[in-house]
């Protein structure tokens, strides 16, 4: 993509309304624009990141055996009355009426709807286990939306719902999602720590939050320092191996980890002092097992092998991709801007023409741009008339992981400069060697 033809509205000044780093940088980097309180437009640059985040989530959900679908954003109030949750959300839920005065709502979550769908079609134990997920925009009318997309009223959510014949099967489904979440966050360059969590209005008796450590996090967290050294499950993990998944779950939950709501001071004090970590963190995922909380009132049952009816056991599993983008920035930035993990960077490589209008640098940039694009790299070529200093600032602000600096002085010696955003390291390299260096 040529920057001269791209829509990237960079802000040089820090917006006054932005209170935290991610909000400031997302506005300055032209990723989002606020349209009303807690509601944002995702501009092209931001959408590229959001799409990459969603693609990783999809790949890991699919790998675990979950099946993607899409449910409507507008739901019937009758479904929520049937579950008994219609009043639980209070004013957070946006209630509306259609032209026929039928009561509807803008869904804040989908337990009721997915249960109603499964109730209608799944009649036999042979159709279980089943895990359905979708990625959908949701709305919760926060009293005080703030911090940009970190705590907004409209947000993108991946929510999955598992259905099993009994508690043992449901626990296997829970462990599948537990492992899938560990892999998802690791692929995004994040160290997510699972912590026992309160179930809140979702309900149930088993729940874990996945927390990444960040100084600006909203939660106070306490954990064993060894979590930072633990390796995520490998790509060849067998999701059908119940015992194997349970061992992964046990390994990731045997050490102490809790948010302030579930903190046990005595248990924390029992950790060797050198291994105790008290920090702040950001929730990036939340999973729940709630048994028959929704299937019971909806009458979601299947006929078992024994010929008897069995109420389906359920779980739900959420990741907020839009919030996750903000969380990644909170966890990975410096004074100059965003430092994207490679897997979600909107562009992998930036080419900076340091002398616009010069035929030699222009030709070298064009050649590099063509070669890298043909090799499958997402490239942003800064071919604008801006001065070199402004181009450096933009490249660092938007977090281009690799930056190729092309100027007449270096080209005279047959070299360009390759900069790594994450650590600022630079090296002189022949243009023809760039591809091999990026692959190294």
Swiss-Prot record:
It catalyses: tRNA(Pro) + L-proline + ATP = L-prolyl-tRNA(Pro) + AMP + diphosphate. Its main location: cytoplasm. It holds the Pfam family tRNA-synt_2b. GO terms for biological process: prolyl-tRNA aminoacylation. It is an enzyme of class 6 (ligase). Its EC number is 6.1.1.15. It is found in: Cytoplasm. InterPro entries: aa-tRNA-synt_IIb, aa-tRNA-synth_II, aa-tRNA-synth_II/BPL/LPL, Anticodon-bd, Anticodon-bd_dom_sf, Pro-tRNA-ligase_IIa, Pro-tRNA-synth_IIa_bac-type, Pro-tRNA_synthetase. Keywords: Aminoacyl-tRNA synthetase, ATP-binding, Cytoplasm, Ligase, Nucleotide-binding, Protein biosynthesis. One of its GO terms (cellular component) is cytosol. One of its GO terms (molecular function) is ATP binding. Homodimer. HAMAP family: Pro_tRNA_synth_type2 (MF_01570). Catalyzes the attachment of proline to tRNA(Pro) in a two-step reaction: proline is first activated by ATP to form Pro-AMP and then transferred to the acceptor end of tRNA(Pro). Belongs to the class-II aminoacyl-tRNA synthetase family. ProS type 2 subfamily. This is Proline--tRNA ligase. The lineage of its organism: Bacteria, Pseudomonadati, Pseudomonadota, Alphaproteobacteria, Hyphomicrobiales. The gene is proS.
């Amino acid at each position: 993509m040529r920057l001269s033809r791209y829509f990237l509205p960079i802000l040089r000044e820090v917006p006054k309304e932005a209170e935290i780093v991610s909000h400031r940088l997302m506005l300055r980097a032209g990723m989002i624009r606020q349209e009303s309180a807690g509601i944002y437009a995702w501009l092209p640059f931001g959408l590229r990141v959001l799409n990459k985040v969603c693609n990783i989530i999809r790949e890991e959900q699919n790998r675990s055996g979950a099946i993607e679908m899409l449910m409507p954003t507008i739901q019937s109030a009758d479904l929520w009355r049937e579950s008994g949750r219609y009043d639980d959300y209070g004013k957070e839920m946006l209630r509306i009426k259609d032209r026929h005065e039928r009561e509807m709502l803008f869904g804040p979550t989908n337990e009721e709807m997915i249960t109603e769908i499964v109730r209608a079609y799944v009649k036999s134990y042979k159709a279980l286990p089943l895990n359905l997920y979708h990625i959908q925009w949701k709305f919760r009318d926060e009293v005080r939306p703030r911090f940009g997309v970190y705590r907004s009223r409209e947000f993108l959510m991946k929510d999955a719902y598992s259905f099993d014949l009994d508690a043992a099967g449901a626990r296997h489904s829970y462990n599948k999602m537990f492992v899938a979440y560990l892999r998802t966050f690791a692929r995004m360059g994040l160290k997510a720590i699972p912590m026992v969590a309160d179930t809140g209005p979702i309900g149930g008796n088993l729940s874990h939050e996945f927390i990444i450590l960040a100084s600006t996090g909203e939660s106070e967290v306490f954990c064993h320092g060894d979590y930072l050294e633990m390796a995520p499950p490998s790509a060849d993990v067998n999701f059908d191996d119940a015992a194997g998944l349970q061992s992964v779950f046990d390994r990731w939950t045997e050490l102490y980890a809790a948010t302030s709501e579930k903190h046990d001071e005595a248990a924390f004090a029992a950790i060797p002092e050198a291994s105790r970590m008290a920090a702040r963190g950001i929730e990036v995922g939340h999973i729940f097992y709630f048994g028959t909380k929704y299937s019971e009132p909806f009458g979601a049952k299947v006929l078992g092998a024994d010929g008897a009816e069995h109420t389906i056991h359920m779980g739900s599993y959420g990741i907020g991709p839009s919030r996750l983008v903000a969380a990644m920035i909170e966890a990975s930035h410096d004074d100059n801007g965003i430092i994207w993990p490679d897997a979600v960077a909107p562009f992998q490589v930036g080419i900076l023409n340091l002398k616009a209008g010069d035929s030699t640098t222009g030709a070298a940039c064009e050649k590099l741009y063509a070669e890298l694009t043909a090799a499958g790299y997402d490239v942003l070529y800064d071919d604008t008339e801006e001065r070199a200093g402004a181009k450096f600032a933009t490249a660092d602000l938007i977090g281009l992981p690799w930056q190729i600096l092309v100027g007449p002085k270096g080209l005279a010696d047959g070299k360009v400069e390759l900069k790594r955003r994450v650590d600022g390291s630079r090296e002189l390299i022949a243009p023809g060697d760039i591809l091999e260096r990026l692959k190294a």
